[in-house]
């Protein structure tokens, strides 16, 4: 079997799909994208195609190593996201060729179901509470919420009090009937992160995500040492070499590699195994589309240290398309009591509505994250 063609489709809301075709008619799908930089990743995918077209798709490891090591400069979000989508599509082809789900190729199931959690946004506590109520009605009991707005390197007690008040209202409204993680989104610098984490402890969040940026990872063990709340990070780490450093330094209780940013299934399977040796949990980052989610689930079902899976159903970013809009076999993604179950179709287990993908790709827009500024005009982290 030989790879004959690679086609990309940028799609609403902010996704990109990759179709890899073969001379035997087997097609694989991947989701290579960086939110807000889809065109850059698209260019990288097509640049890398010269190493892929004409190759045997079964040689996933060799293709991955060629894409990663074939250039003197490597790593980073654009290249690793391009590799990730190609890798996902190759696993999809291999599973389809052999007639088995990808998790069977990775050693088989280690669990029967995986808990899903849902992101809940809202500018007011009442909006967040209403969003949680709606999701609990369909079986969710675990959520992720924004931990704070933008915050200066040294900021006021008023900012801290405002962030804590929101969390307090949510905990008061639901008690221990729900669990929620708090995402600082890398908006907070270390001095304020120390204060904010301490003030949030009475409300027992499930985890604190990205309390500081990955570039400031030396603070993860320092912050972890001062709190009993698990620290999570990893969506802006792009290879096992990035994770090697933070795992060796300690501090993280949960790693969150993104299967569409961190080299795909091949790389994230290794990252998960490496984390297990440090007794660190896995919770793949996934605010993206159905192919990315399927890739995450295949790793979740073979990694013993996987604890829960993010998914983007109803997320506020999904303007113009929902999670399963481009999927034919929607029922295969059905959750029961807030859990996903193994996908049973060969490959990634996602049947893509290609006709709709082609049509909607004509309506793609260039999504950009907001640019926030402090009152003094300086750019803030979003």
Swiss-Prot record:
Keyword Magnesium belongs to the record: yes
Superkingdom: Bacteria
Family membership noted in the UniProt record: Belongs to the mandelate racemase/muconate lactonizing enzyme family. GalD subfamily.
GO molecular function: galactonate dehydratase activity; magnesium ion binding
Lineage: Bacteria, Pseudomonadati, Pseudomonadota, Gammaproteobacteria, Enterobacterales
Native source organism of the sequence: Serratia proteamaculans (strain 568)
Stated name of the protein: D-galactonate dehydratase
Xref: HAMAP family: Galacton_dehydrat (MF_01289)
Pathway recorded for this protein: Carbohydrate acid metabolism; D-galactonate degradation; D-glyceraldehyde 3-phosphate and pyruvate from D-galactonate: step 1/3
